[in-house]
Amino acid sequence: MSSPVLIEIKSRYPQMNEAMRRIADYVISSESDIIYLKASDFAEKSGVSTASVSRFVKLLGYKNFNEFRLKMAVTEEKNVNEKPEEKDRLVYNGEAIGKSPYEVSKTIFSKSIRELEDTWNMMDFDILEPVANLIDRANRIVAIGVGRSKITTEALVSRLYRIGYYIVDFCDSHEIVNITSILKEGDLLIAVSNFGQSKSVVEGVKRAKRRGVTVVGITSVKDSPLAQYSDYVLFSAYDYASDKMGKLYEPSSENVAQLVLVDCL
């Protein structure tokens, strides 16, 4: 399980500029070293200015670097008793060459387990009941998502349809334009985008909002456009490794976390 600080950093990573990403990369790779560093030393090791460090910790909600470092120290103390092999099994760099089928499978399963644990730690349980009530009262329920987000929208349709709710989903950009142009007050739009930046999804949300439609967003990235425009947001854990490895690597763990969020509704 990632620490609360790392979960917060990873959830904001896609929205960070280059300097902040350097800092985030250093924190994620050298978590235990930070508690011994001064702000100037931390900036030097991260390859950024002290001003960038100040902006970074304030983005995470801390007044200054010392407060951030104290939080990291508390987290490190909690992790002292964690078994080394338990920590090692959760390290995933995408390299499968030379590993046995058992090792590869164990790594993939461990990755999904950690994504679920991190998603649990990000949960805002206070919005689950209001969102469930919106689903129950909505005149019409529409889910939108492109690419692999369609996996989540299809699961949502399957679950709600089986218990008596009429819901449809759209994954084509033109269809999203059409449906969000005719939704009206009393309807519910559920929008899914892992990074929260899919243009057709975000534009669809904005279009629906102008028509008085309530929007529930499902995303991994805080402060993303989808999160900003949604009335309610369900956050799933962000896969930092997939971002570092590029678009060719799309782990199922992110979809698993979103599917479990759907089950919670």
Q: Where do the model's predicted regions map?
A:
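Pre-recognition alpha-helix immediately N-terminal to the DNA-recognition helix
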Residues: 22-28
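HTH-adjacent hinge/linker in prokaryotic transcriptional regulators
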Residues: 2-6, 15, 32-36, 40, ...
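Glycine-rich phosphate-binding loops that contact phosphosugars or nucleotide phosphates
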Residues: 136-260, 264
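Short helix-coil-helix linker/hinge
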Residues: 16-22
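CheY-like receiver
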Residues: 26, 131-134, 179
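Glycine-rich phosphate/diphosphate-binding loops that line cofactor/substrate pockets in enzymes
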Residues: 126-138
